[in-house]
Amino acid sequence: MAEEQVNLSAGLAPDCEASATAESTVSLVGTCEAAAKSPEPKDSDSTCVFCRIAGRQDPGTELLHCENEDLICFKDIKPAATHHYLVVPKKHIGNCRTLRKDQVELVENMVTVGKTILERNNFTDFTNVRMGFHMPPFCSISHLHLHVLAPVDQLGFLSKLVYRVNSYWFITADHLIEKLRT
């Protein structure tokens, strides 16, 4: 299938994240590059920690109730904010650079799940929320995942850098959706 793939590197650059165990950080650049070369999503990758979590093969990760059958949500193991959740597709998708125009709805659904999880946890000030993706090669897990962070006004110095809006290494969900649509 020769579907059009959006070039997110124009004007930006590198998605992924440091929210898994040490063994999952082995070959970051190689796995992100491999994912970028293969835009067709696989159902699952046995070497991917997020695929194992989605397949309920990681009993140490508590899945949060998610009303979307194609997505899972769980707390980040290294939270940068009081509320720091990851919304992850069950199907293996490498990162935000591998997304195509026809996958805008997936990203929108990820945002909806993020907002719903925040509301369920009594956080409703959406002006104080940041949702976005790390860009390759600045990712530790080469499986698409949305960071949901709140309250952002309480992020520490390093977290403000790591999750800096529309930087070389982090793109907000809204900006990604806009890029995918153009």
Swiss-Prot record:
Positions that bind AMP: D76, I77, H145, L146, H147
GO molecular function: adenosine 5'-monophosphoramidase activity; nucleotide binding
Keywords associated with the record: Acetylation, Cytoplasm, Hydrolase, Nucleotide-binding, Nucleus
E.C. numbers: 3.9.1.-
Localization (cell): Cytoplasm; Nucleus
Pfam family, one: DcpS_C
InterPro entries reported in the protein's UniProt record: HIT-like, HIT-like_sf
Subunit structure: Forms dimers to octamers and even larger oligomer. Interacts with CALM1.
Family assignment from sequence similarity: Belongs to the HINT family.
Stated name of the protein: Adenosine 5'-monophosphoramidase HINT3
Organism whose genome encodes this protein: Pongo abelii (Sumatran orangutan)
Lineage: Eukaryota, Metazoa, Chordata, Craniata, Vertebrata
This protein's encoding gene: HINT3
